[in-house]
């Protein structure tokens, strides 16, 4: 279960700790969404863990709880066209940078001194061009509460977007598959071709039928 041990080390050095994670690197359709979360030292978020280990109902409840507790949080969204333009890795970094900027701006708007920011980034790739201290944490959404909170913010935001997109493109089953490559989704691509939400670089030429 995620906890605050990593954060406490940084808090002792006077840092503002920002957990960073993403959702949606692998789907065939939809955006990649990143989130950044700044928790206070007394944060109490029982049951918050890696978003993939939680039920949808628990994630939704945690989403509201995290927003209520956090000192600052931010969301970054990069759409399919941009993913195709710069590749998924760079798009993920772009979304993360947006999210960190949003979280820091929210925290800065609160009374009190703003401490030097330190990032805890899920995975093994540091955020490029970040000028301050950062640490990558493999499996961080199960180790750091700040990263786990960010993972929930990112996933719930993205899932809600895909459910909304389903109303516009119901043939692809986005509400169910969230843009991932389920059999239903691949069958729909074979039948209808891609829609504007699809990542052209993620699907083979066989499925691409331009309108």
Swiss-Prot record:
Top-level taxon of the source organism: Bacteria
Gene symbol of the encoding locus: rnhB2
Pfam families for this protein: RNase_HII
EC nos: 3.1.26.4
PROSITE patterns: RNASE_H_2
NCBIfam families recorded: PRK00015.1-3
Record's function text: Endonuclease that specifically degrades the RNA of RNA-DNA hybrids.
Record's protein name: Ribonuclease HII 2
Binding site for a divalent metal cation: 21-22, 122
Key words, A-Z: Cytoplasm, Endonuclease, Hydrolase, Manganese, Metal-binding, Nuclease
Record's GO cellular component terms: cytoplasm; ribonuclease H2 complex
């Amino acid at each position: 279960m995620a906890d605050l041990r990593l954060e406490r080390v940084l808090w002792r050095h006077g840092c503002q700790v920002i957990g960073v994670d993403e959702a949606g690197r692998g789907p065939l359709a939809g955006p990649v969404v990143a989130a950044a979360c700044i928790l206070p030292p007394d944060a109490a978020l029982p049951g918050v863990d890696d978003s993939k280990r939680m039920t949808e109902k628990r994630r939704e409840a945690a989403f509201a709880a995290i927003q209520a507790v956090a000192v600052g949080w931010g969301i970054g969204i990069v759409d399919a066209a941009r993913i195709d333009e710069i590749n998924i890795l760079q798009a993920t970094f772009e979304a993360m940078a947006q999210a960190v900027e949003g979280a820091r701006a929210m925290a800065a708007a609160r009374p009190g001194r703003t401490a030097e920011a330190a990032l805890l980034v899920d995975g093994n790739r540091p955020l490029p061009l970040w000028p301050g201290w950062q640490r990558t944490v493999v499996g961080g959404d199960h180790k750091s509460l700040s990263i786990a909170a960010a993972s929930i913010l990112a996933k719930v935001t993205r899932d809600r977007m895909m459910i909304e997109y389903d109303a516009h493109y119901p043939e692809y089953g986005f509400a169910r598959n969230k843009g991932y490559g389920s059999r239903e989704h691949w069958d729909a691509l074979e039948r209808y071709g891609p829609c504007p939400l699809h990542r052209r670089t993620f699907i083979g030429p066989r499925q691409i039928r331009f309108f």
